[in-house]
């Protein structure tokens, strides 16, 4: 029997929900109330994100189920010297029931970071920038405690009711500025951006005692992501002993140069070399598309200077709808002769 069901209600799931049901509930609720949507509600979105952050952590979920939201926020209940009830029992006497130690106040930025990591850094709906969400425009949260008053519950020195020995007020945590964001360029091939490949690699970072350590980072690329797309991982960089937190890592997609294709938005450009003869009499060739298929190209008429041919649906996937693709644009590069002999000149003169 859980103490309260508020967080489960925010995600639209039952207290017995498993991990997949929690993720499904968060996805539906977060998309509905995201501030960029017409149905958006910033405060509701923050509550939904905090609910998922707590319930998706087995330890925090256990604390929430047993003691409630404030306990989950602060990491668990604390008791006086006499334990629960203490030597003098509960209810305003020495050694009575303890309160909760203070924890990090869940902020708007925390909400957007959770959303970004859940969806891999890209926008899951139209109207947002292809490079993902920018969190710098959203203010950080952080209230003084329940009721907005210093000292937490009741806002009075003695806790609830202001009586010594009763419930102690929530202790306030020191407020630190947001951890530094370290950007790391991530070179990716067009083929990997086409299919949306998973990239896994190990990074070195400083641990709590200054020693070097390694951790694995997994990035699930989304089909059609472009250069400049940012994927943010909070609390994954070097450890900061002053705050007890880690720096934020932000990976920036960089497109590797391709031997055959040049990208222009969702379109791919292929330059096809032609001899002077082929440019006049026509040609029949094949090229390999970005997804490995063979595409036949042919013409029976002369190729005009700066002429191109467009093949719809043969380019890169569009990030907002990967089932749709841009175009393949073929440009022709004619190898014009540097010089002509007399016979060639006569042939041109007699026929043109």
UniProtKB/Swiss-Prot annotation:
Residues 300-325 are annotated as: Disordered. Its main location: cytoplasm. Residues 301-312 have a biased composition (Polar residues). The keyword Disulfide bond does not apply. SUPFAM superfamilies: Chaperone J-domain, HSP40/DnaJ peptide-binding domain. GO terms for cellular component: cytosol; cytosolic small ribosomal subunit; nucleolus; nucleus. The modification Phosphoserine is found at residue 275. Keywords: Cell cycle, Chaperone, Cytoplasm, DNA-binding, Nucleus, Phosphoprotein. InterPro entries: DnaJ_C (IPR002939), DnaJ_domain (IPR001623), DnaJ_domain_CS (IPR018253), DnaJ_subfamily_B (IPR051339), HSP40/DnaJ_pept-bd (IPR008971), J_dom_sf (IPR036869). One of its GO terms (biological process) is misfolded protein transport. Residues 4-70 form the J domain. Present with 20300 molecules/cell in log phase SD medium. Required for nuclear migration during mitosis. It is required for the normal initiation of translation. Might mediate the dissociation of a specific protein complex of the translation machinery. Essential for viability. This is Protein SIS1. It comes from Saccharomyces cerevisiae (strain ATCC 204508 / S288c).
């Amino acid at each position: 029997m859980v103490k309260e069901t508020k967080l489960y209600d925010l995600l639209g799931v039952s207290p017995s929900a498993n991990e997949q049901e929690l993720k499904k509930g968060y996805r539906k609720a977060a998309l509905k109330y995201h501030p960029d949507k017409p149905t958006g509600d910033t405060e509701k979105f923050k509550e939904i994100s905090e609910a998922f952050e707590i319930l998706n952590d087995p330890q925090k979920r256990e604390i929430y189920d047993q003691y409630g939201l404030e306990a989950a926020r602060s990491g668990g209940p604390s008791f006086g010297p006499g334990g629960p009830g203490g030597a003098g029992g509960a209810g305003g006497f020495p050694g009575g029931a303890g309160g909760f130690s203070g924890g990090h106040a869940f902020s708007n930025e925390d909400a957007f970071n959770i959303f970004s990591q859940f969806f891999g850094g890209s926008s899951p709906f139209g109207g947002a920038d292809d490079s993902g969400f920018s969190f710098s425009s959203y203010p950080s949260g952080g209230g003084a405690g329940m009721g907005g008053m210093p000292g937490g519950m009741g806002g009075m020195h003695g806790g609830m009711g202001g009586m010594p020995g009763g419930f102690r007020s929530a202790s306030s945590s020191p407020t630190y500025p947001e951890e530094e964001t370290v950007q790391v360029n991530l070179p990716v091939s067009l083929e990997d951006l086409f299919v949306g490949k998973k990239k896994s690699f190990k990074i070195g970072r400083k641990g709590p005692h200054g020693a070097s350590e390694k951790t694995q980072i997994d990035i699930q690329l989304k089909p059609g992501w472009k250069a400049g797309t940012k994927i943010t991982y909070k609390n994954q960089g070097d450890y900061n002993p002053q705050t007890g937190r880690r720096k934020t890592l932000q990976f920036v997609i960089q497109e590797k140069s391709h031997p055959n294709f040049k990208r222009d938005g969702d379109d791919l450009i292929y330059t096809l070399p032609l001899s002077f003869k082929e440019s006049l009499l026509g040609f029949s060739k094949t090229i390999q598309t970005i997804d490995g298929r063979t595409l036949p190209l042919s013409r029976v008429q002369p190729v005009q200077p700066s002429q191109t041919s467009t093949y719809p649906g043969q380019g890169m996937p569009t990030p907002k709808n990967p089932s749709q693709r841009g175009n393949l644009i073929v440009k022709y590069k004619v190898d014009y002769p540097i010089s002509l002999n007399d016979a060639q000149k006569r042939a041109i003169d007699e026929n043109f």
